[in-house]
């Protein structure tokens, strides 16, 4: 795979949706009508199937592995919520009890041997196992924004990255056309191009990207966004380190760090105000919004991917316990369909 195409591939791989098509000419008709298909009854699932096919076309089918965020490893730990967050949400996440967490760190894209220093999103998936038996998922990436405001953008970008049959490479004119036609891609693309990759997952912030609704005991809703801030501080590779970095270092760095004690993140919740975007994960909220500490995540172990408790978890971001609800963000809802298809395929391959 040529370098320029690889960089664009990983740049769109921020969630379990991102990749590009390498052999999708039969789906051209679908791509020409992605907006109408995605918005029609059953269309969300059709686009999700096409996206998963595209992942396999771009990266190959790696049996038993996730179609995206393929490279990663597992972890376990616990979360303790705050009373302040409990005033805004009746979720058991914020009862103040220690909640069991199973997690996974990952690199965007469908390449199981991706370089740990590539300029692509890093992921953190968390499953909270509440004492009442309910499950709650939080799935995040390390960029503050996403690249697409609608599901149709996915296939548009994948088709722009399709290999030309004659050259075996993506057509630069199609890539340029995509960039021009989809300005919602620009913010994340710029972030990845100008921000060096993290030196360790322990030094990596993670963003929920979407807007969610907290529901309190009286039924009042509050729009929120959240991020997880590393207690060890944020740290990116320097330019010199980026050049010299080995292909593999993230697993070893986390193993070494967790041996020293729990690796912690603070969950920071931002309170939305009227006019703040509810349904567009490419748009950041203005600075200066009220923020609260909603809890502390502590991770205490490392496990290789397929030996970890996270291996069989879907990390569907629409898996929410009572007290937290989704907005009408079409990308958030689309992720659920795409994750389910990826999960189903890999489970049948094990």
Q: Where are each of the predicted segments found?
A:
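Active-site-adjacent core segments of small-molecule enzymes
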Residues: 2-19, 24, 29-350
């Amino acid at each position: 795979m040529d370098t320029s195409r690889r960089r664009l591939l990983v740049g769109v791989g921020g969630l379990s949706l991102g990749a590009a098509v390498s052999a999708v000419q039969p789906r051209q008709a679908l791509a020409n009508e992605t907006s109408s298909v995605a918005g029609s009854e059953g269309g969300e699932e059709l686009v999700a199937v096409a996206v998963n096919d595209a992942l396999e076309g771009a990266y190959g089918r790696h049996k038993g592995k996730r179609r995206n965020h393929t490279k990663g490893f597992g972890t376990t730990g616990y979360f303790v919520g705050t009373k302040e967050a409990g005033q805004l949400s009746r979720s058991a996440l914020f009862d103040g009890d220690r909640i069991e967490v199973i997690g996974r760190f990952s690199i965007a894209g469908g390449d199981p041997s991706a370089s740990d220093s590539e300029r692509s999103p890093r992921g953190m998936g968390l499953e909270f196992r509440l004492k009442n038996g309910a499950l709650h998922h939080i799935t995040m990436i390390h960029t503050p924004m996403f690249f697409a405001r609608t599901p149709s953008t996915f296939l548009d970008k994948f088709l722009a990255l399709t290999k030309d049959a004659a050259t075996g490479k993506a057509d630069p004119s199609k890539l340029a056309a995509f960039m021009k036609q989809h300005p919602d891609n620009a913010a994340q693309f710029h972030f990845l191009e100008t921000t060096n990759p993290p030196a360790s997952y322990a030094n990596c912030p993670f963003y929920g990207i979407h807007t969610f609704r907290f529901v309190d005991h009286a039924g009042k809703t509050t729009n929120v966004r959240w991020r997880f801030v590393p207690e060890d501080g944020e740290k990116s590779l320097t330019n010199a380190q980026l050049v010299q970095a080995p292909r593999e270092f993230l697993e070893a760095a986390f193993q070494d760090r967790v041996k020293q004690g729990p690796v912690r993140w603070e969950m920071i919740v931002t309170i939305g105000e009227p006019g703040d975007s509810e349904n567009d994960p490419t748009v950041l909220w203005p600075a200066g919004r009220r923020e609260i500490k909603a809890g502390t995540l502590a991770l205490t172990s490392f496990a290789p991917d397929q030996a970890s408790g996270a291996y069989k978890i879907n990390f569907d971001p629409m898996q929410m316990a009572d007290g937290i609800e989704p907005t009408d963000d079409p990308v958030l809802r689309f992720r659920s369909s795409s994750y389910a298809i990826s999960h189903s395929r890999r489970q049948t391959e094990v």
